[in-house]
Amino acid sequence: LVLSIGSRLSIRQVGYNYKTWARAAFVIVNDIDCEELKKPSVHVDMAVHADAGDLLERLDGELDAIFAEEGEKLPESISRPGLKQLFEGGEGLPGMNWSETCRMWKETYPVVQPKHWASGEMEPANVYAAIEAISSRLKENQITVVGNGSACVVGGHGYVIKKGQRFITNSAVAAMGYDLPAAIGAWTASRENRFYSQGTDRGGEDLVLVTGDGSIQMNLQELQTIIHHKMGIKIFLINNGGYHSIRQTQKNFFGEPLIGIGVDSGDLSFPDMEKLAAAYGYPYVKAEHNRELAEAVEKTLNTEGPVICEIFVSMDQNFEPKSSAKRLPDGTLVSPPLEDMAPFLSDEEMDRNMIIPRIR
């Protein structure tokens, strides 16, 4: 069963070979835009044309009715002792249910790996190590907003999410420059909107923004808005020398010469962030190597008010795992199903991890 509520289910979410997405699942899709329910890139077994809030309220009422009628008969939750379990989860790999299978995958294929922390003393920091260093230090109920590129992709992959936290991303629905306005909006909402506070002490916590050196340039003027209103927004800036998503695409499909990337293409550059921070009145912190990450993160989080922490990361670290084209022996490029991601597993290992028949 796949239940999608208020999501566009864009190509970025279902994969380029979209006909293979959720091919063995019963798919329920809710959207307020009826045209989104008709697009050919998503197969829909049950379409629900409704406001997401109305649907969730109705579902909540149905669940309350089930618990009122059958609550005493329901088993205790394995993952949350003391609470009742309404749904045990579907079948997983042999001998496991779906939840157990997911836990096994997380342990077998961790996003942040020892190799990401193993860079040499003088090598640039690794973006996966940086994301882990930032997220592992945050408190419960804290809000994180991420921008585009590495912040969005690696943040979505490797962020350590704790109880009550919000992770706000624009993946597949917005352009570069989303970061600063989104952080300002989330900061304001967290102090004024009951849906963000939800009875927590969220209003007393600083907000974290993780963004990139390219994305932040698109709405740079909003740095003044943050300073002017003394918003407690901690800005972690991932500096990968340009537009890293475009860099990977060009390297994977075309090779050199690179065009419109950054320092390695030679035709594009960004201003010095330390000087910009000073111009806007921000305290500035930086980390250039993995060994400096912990101290830089600690100093940033302990600085009162808004602050910018620039982290200089390697330009050679690709996003992983990622949906990527495969090159066949005859040179043909094909888009594999979404579950078959780069770096690609061997045929034997893929077969061991499949619950439904595999598409080769």
Question: Where is each model-derived feature located?
Answer:
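Conserved acidic/glycine
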Residues: 68-123, 312, 325-360
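General beta-strand structural signal in soluble alpha/beta enzymes
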Residues: 4-5, 29-30, 48, 144-148, ...
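Active-site diphosphate/adenylate-binding microenvironment
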Residues: 100-200
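Generic structural signal for well-ordered, non-membrane alpha-helical segments
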Residues: 48, 52, 56, 94-98, ...
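Short active-site oxyanion
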Residues: 44-45, 141-144, 282
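Active-site glycine- and acidic-residue-rich loops that bind
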Residues: 10-11, 123-126, 215-218
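Thiamine diphosphate
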Residues: 40, 49, 56-59, 154, ...
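Glycine-rich, acidic loop regions that bind phosphate or pyrophosphate groups
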Residues: 1-101, 297, 301
